[in-house]
């Protein structure tokens, strides 16, 4: 397919975000995901535009859909950050002013002001926290338990482990965000949003950034 071919509408193509564990898709405004072993069963007929943070999963996609196009070079995000992941770049591209929290296998926090990425940090994801506690001491090998509030101090080890985990994440987000709007995406976004009253869950945030990138490249027509 020629690089300059353009599409009139999102429904004419499929966006793909290749992560470390799952491969996520957006077809028009419908979201779905797949393990790499199940890609062929999807039977995708439309043109695929993708980003990737995992080489093995990217190869799996290309084995099934060899005409899929990597859009990493289709846009420019203003930033001084060296080595910013393509998924973080796309999420930042979708926000003009605010704090972007991607709560996936790792939790990334990025600040954007007037369209420029100012910097960010990376925390372990919830599963990584649980694994770290398990490695630290037998008594800290506690199952994850969703908390309703951080207002009451825990009275047992299981709650204390989960409390410390969530408080460290929320405190970091609040420290960086101050009075800025917080946008959350990723698998644990909805859970974390309960502790951030002025936040907004945007499960399509990375795909919104991809849509903007394609429009800037002239591949998707602006509306």
Swiss-Prot record:
Keywords per UniProt: ATP-binding, Coenzyme A biosynthesis, Cytoplasm, Kinase, Metal-binding, Nucleotide-binding, Potassium, Transferase
Enzyme Commission number: 2.7.1.33
Pathway where this protein functions: Cofactor biosynthesis; coenzyme A biosynthesis; CoA from (R)-pantothenate: step 1/5
Cofactor(s) in the UniProt record: NH4(+); K(+)
One GO term describing the cellular component: cytoplasm
InterPro entries in the record: ATPase_NBD, Type_III_PanK
Assembly and interaction partners: Homodimer.
Listed HAMAP family: Pantothen_kinase_3
Protein name: Type III pantothenate kinase
Organism: Helicobacter pylori (strain J99 / ATCC 700824)
Lineage: Bacteria, Pseudomonadati, Campylobacterota, Epsilonproteobacteria, Campylobacterales
């Amino acid at each position: 397919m020629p690089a300059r071919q353009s599409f009139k509408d999102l429904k004419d193509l499929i966006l793909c975000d290749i992560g470390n564990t799952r491969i996520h898709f957006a077809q028009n405004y419908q979201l779905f995901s797949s393990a790499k072993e199940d890609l062929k069963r999807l039977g995708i007929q439309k043109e695929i535009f993708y980003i990737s943070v995992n080489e093995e999963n990217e190869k799996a996609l290309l084995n099934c859909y060899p005409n899929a196009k990597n859009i990493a070079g289709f846009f420019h995000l203003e930033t001084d950050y060296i080595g910013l992941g393509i998924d973080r770049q796309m999420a930042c591209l979708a926000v003009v002013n605010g704090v972007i929290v991607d709560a996936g296998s790792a939790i990334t926090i990025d600040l954007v002001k007037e369209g420029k990425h100012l910097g960010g940090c990376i925390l372990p994801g919830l599963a990584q926290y649980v694994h770290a506690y398990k490695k630290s001491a037998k008594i800290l090998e506690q199952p994850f338990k969703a908390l309703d509030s951080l207002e009451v101090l825990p009275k047992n080890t299981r709650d204390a482990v989960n409390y410390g985990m969530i408080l460290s994440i929320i405190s970091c987000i609040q420290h960086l965000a101050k009075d800025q709007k917080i946008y959350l995406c990723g698998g644990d976004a909805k859970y974390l949003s309960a502790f951030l009253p002025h936040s907004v869950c945007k499960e399509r945030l990375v795909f919104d950034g991809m849509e903007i990138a394609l429009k800037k490249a002239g591949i998707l027509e602006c509306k």
